[in-house]
Each structure stands twice: as structure tokens, then as C-alpha cells.
Amino acid sequence: MASNNDSIKKTLFVVIALSLVCSIIVSTAAVGLRDKQKVNAVLDKQSKIVEVAGINESGSVPELFAKYIEPRLIDFKTGNFVDGDATAYDQRKASKDPAQSIKLTAEQDKAKIIRRANTGVVYLVKSGDEISKVIVPVHGNGLWSMMYAFVAVETDGNTVSGITYYEQGETPGLGGEVENPSWRAQFVGKKLFDDNHQPAIKVVKGGAPAGSEHGVDGLSGATLTSNGVQHTFDFWLGDMGFGPFLAKVRDGGLN
């Protein structure tokens, strides 16, 4: 009888020990995977910024980013630069914190983002000792997802030099075409603002008129996603978004 009890105890001990070992292995692997995912997310974001900046030099993404890109923080209300570590700042996280953000009214919330952080990140593209472009991150709701993009702007604060979407979950082949290079190429050379400095980008269903300064073709079969792109620009070019900052850029506030 005692022998049977000893055998049961040994079996239980082995089972418990194996369970603990397996738990430790799984936990360690999960932590390692999360860390790797974070690193990959940062690398992918940097890659998109380098791409939209038009940097074609050979080298690793981290090297090119460090050499040519300077992240800076701005106060959305004034458009002024503010002190702080822009590299460590998480604007998405800040927008969810009532102490670091504001809740938008229905009238203000054209892009359907609900809250906007008080502080934003912009990326200055360096050319020697001067700034050649600025990159502003924008996001807005599409049909199925929040769509995140980077828009590169010349130092006139008005002319688009590139756009790239780095996170979206729209329908492949329809709204997902926001990532199509041919569609994105339409934005190059477009003017963000009209002569009165009001947001002027227009995503036109059926196609923008030839030679339009502000118009780009809507996405075929993806009206709601196209509307989301329109509303994204309407919000982020306005007074609640990067409007005040881009006005300072337009007035020569970079170099």
C-alpha cells in the first residue's frame, strides 16, 4: 500500500514539475515573441518613413533613419515644437489617456478617431544642415478599419511629395488599394491647401479632373474607404490637426 502511495506521489511530482517547466518555457517564448514583434513594428514604421521621404541611398533602415530623419514633438494647438523624447513618445497611447488628449465633438471628429492627443510627432527630413521635407502621420476610419498613413510635404508646407499607408484593414483589391503605388502616386505634386489656406485635397468618385491641383481619383468600388481618406485629410489638415504646424512651415519656420 505504501509502495502504491509513493508511486502516486512520484507521478504527481513529475506531472507538476513538467507543467511548471512547460509554463516557464511558454512564458519565456511569449515574452521573447512580444519583444521581437515590437522591434519589427518599429523597423516597419521606420522603413515606411524612409520610403515616403524619398531616400534611395543604400544602407540599413535604422542607419538611414538615424542619418536623415529627425522626429520632433509639436503642440497641436499652437503648431509649435515642444521639448520631449519624440522617439519614445507613443501618440496612439497618449490619445487614449484623458490627461494627454481631448475628446472630439461630433462636428470636430471628421476622421472618426474619437480622441486626439495634445502632442503629436512629426518627422523632419534632413538634407545637410537644412530640412528638405516634413512628414506628418495621419489616420482616419475607413470602411472596416482605422487607416494609418505618412504624408511627406515639401518645405512650402503645401506640396505633397509622397504618401504611404502603413497600417489598414480594408478589403483587399478594393479599399486595400490605398497601398497601391499607382494610386498613391497621384498625390505627388498636389496642393494640400487652397489660396485661402483651407484644406483642399479632394478624393473624387469617378476620377478627378485632369490637371487638378487638389484632386485625386477615388478608389474604384470602395466609396466608403475613399470617403475615409477624404475625411482623414479634412481633419488632419485643419485647425485640430497639423494645420497650425503646416502654417508655420509655410511661413519658413523650419530652416
UniProtKB/Swiss-Prot annotation:
Primary localisation category: membrane
Cellular compartments per GO CC: plasma membrane
Catalysed transformations (reactions): a ubiquinone + n Na(+)(in) + NADH + H(+) = a ubiquinol + n Na(+)(out) + NAD(+)
GO molecular function: FMN binding; oxidoreductase activity, acting on NAD(P)H, quinone or similar compound as acceptor
GO biological process, one term: sodium ion transport
Localization per Swiss-Prot or TrEMBL: Cell inner membrane
EC number: 7.2.1.1
InterPro entries on file: FMN-bd, NqrC
Uppermost EC category: translocase
Cofactor list: FMN
One Pfam family cited in the UniProt record for this chain: FMN_bind
FMN phosphoryl threonine modifications at: T223
Alphabetically ordered keywords of this record: Cell inner membrane, Cell membrane, Flavoprotein, FMN, Ion transport, Membrane, NAD, Phosphoprotein, Sodium, Sodium transport, Translocase, Transmembrane, Transmembrane helix, Transport, Ubiquinone
Bilayer topology: Single-pass membrane protein
SMART domains (alphabetical): FMN_bind
TM region(s), chain numbering: 12-32
NCBIfam families: nqrC, PRK05346.1-1, PRK05346.1-5
Family, per entry: Belongs to the NqrC family.
Assembly: Composed of six subunits; NqrA, NqrB, NqrC, NqrD, NqrE and NqrF.
Function, as annotated: NQR complex catalyzes the reduction of ubiquinone-1 to ubiquinol by two successive reactions, coupled with the transport of Na(+) ions from the cytoplasm to the periplasm. NqrA to NqrE are probably involved in the second step, the conversion of ubisemiquinone to ubiquinol.
Name of the protein: Na(+)-translocating NADH-quinone reductase subunit C
